[in-house]
Structures are given as C-alpha cells and as structure tokens.
C-alpha cells in the first residue's frame, strides 16, 4: 500500500509516544512538544531533499493549525491556505485537513474544503494511534492528495496560476 518513497519519508519522521488530546490539559502539553519536534524534523528533511512544501503554526493551545502549502507544477508554484482543528478525540481521530479556497472544486473534498482521506489515510492512521501525529497527517494525507488532485485541477482549468 505504501511505496518506497513514502516509506522512506515516514521512516524519517519521529513516531510519537504520548497518547493525549486537547481534553487532557497536562499531558496535552507534552504531546504538543512531540508534535512540534516531529514537524520540525519533517520540515528539515523536506528542505534537505529539496521538497519543502508547507508551513504550519498553531494557536497557543495547539488546537487550531493554519498555514500555507504549495505544489510545484510545470515549474509554477501553486500556493494554498491550509487549516485544521485538532479533534477532541485526538489522537484516536485524525485531523481533517482543509484547503478552503478549493472548496467545491473537486469531488475528493467535503464541505468547507476538507480533503477526502477516508479510503487510504484513515485506516492507516487508526492502525498507528498514538504513533502518528500532525507531521504524519501532512506526509500521508495532504501530500498525496495534492500530488493527485492539483495537476488534475490545473489540467481541467479549474485552478490557474496566480502571479505574485
């Protein structure tokens, strides 16, 4: 189910230990520390391999995340706002990643611009609770979704390149 490239990417993202969500206030701080460490490592790895593709930050509580992601297609950079909330049942429930500006532009998306991850990602996440975190959701959820959907949306003329 997972190709060699994805397997290599995954093996370089630290696995998380602490099983805590936003409701467990004291332990959640420790889980957030693990989340940030894994995200930092993932971004560093991406930069070293020349595949840097997102920036994220969170609110003070670590329950709302937002930032930008981008996809390179034919040497043009397509940039999108990305956002998600950490579910109260996290890490049992994976975050639902949204690209609001693409809402309604593809069938592989739910209302509000939430990307469809049910078939491939959610079963994998469920088998790896609490080891997977936000970095894993980006690597196994958003990255493959962008790789499949963005070129298709570009070819259909649904999204176009915007000069900056």
Curated annotation (Swiss-Prot):
Transmembrane segments: none annotated. Keywords: Ubl conjugation pathway. GO terms for cellular component: cytoplasm. One of its GO terms (biological process) is protein K69-linked ufmylation. It comes from the Eukaryota. One of its GO terms (molecular function) is UFM1 conjugating enzyme activity. The active site is at 116 (glycyl thioester intermediate). E2-like enzyme which forms an intermediate with UFM1 via a thioester linkage. Belongs to the ubiquitin-conjugating enzyme family. UFC1 subfamily. This is Ubiquitin-fold modifier-conjugating enzyme 1. It comes from Drosophila sechellia. The lineage of its organism: Eukaryota, Metazoa, Ecdysozoa, Arthropoda, Hexapoda.
């Amino acid at each position: 189910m997972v190709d060699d490239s994805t397997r290599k990417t995954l093996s370089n993202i630290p696995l998380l230990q602490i099983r805590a969500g936003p409701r467990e206030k004291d332990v959640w701080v420790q889980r957030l520390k693990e989340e940030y460490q894994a995200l930092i490592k993932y971004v560093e790895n991406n930069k070293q391999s020349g595949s840097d593709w997102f920036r994220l930050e969170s609110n003070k509580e670590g329950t709302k995340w937002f930032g930008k992601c981008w996809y390179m297609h034919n040497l043009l950079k397509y940039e999108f706002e990305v956002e998600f909330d950490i579910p109260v049942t996290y890490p049992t429930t994976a975050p639902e990643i949204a690209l609001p500006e693409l809402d309604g532009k593809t069938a592989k998306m739910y209302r509000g611009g939430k990307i469809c991850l049910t078939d491939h990602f959610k079963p994998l996440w469920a088998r790896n609770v609490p080891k997977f975190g936000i970095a894993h959701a980006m690597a196994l959820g958003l990255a493959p979704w962008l790789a499949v959907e963005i070129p298709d949306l570009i070819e259909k003329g649904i999204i176009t390149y915007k000069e900056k």
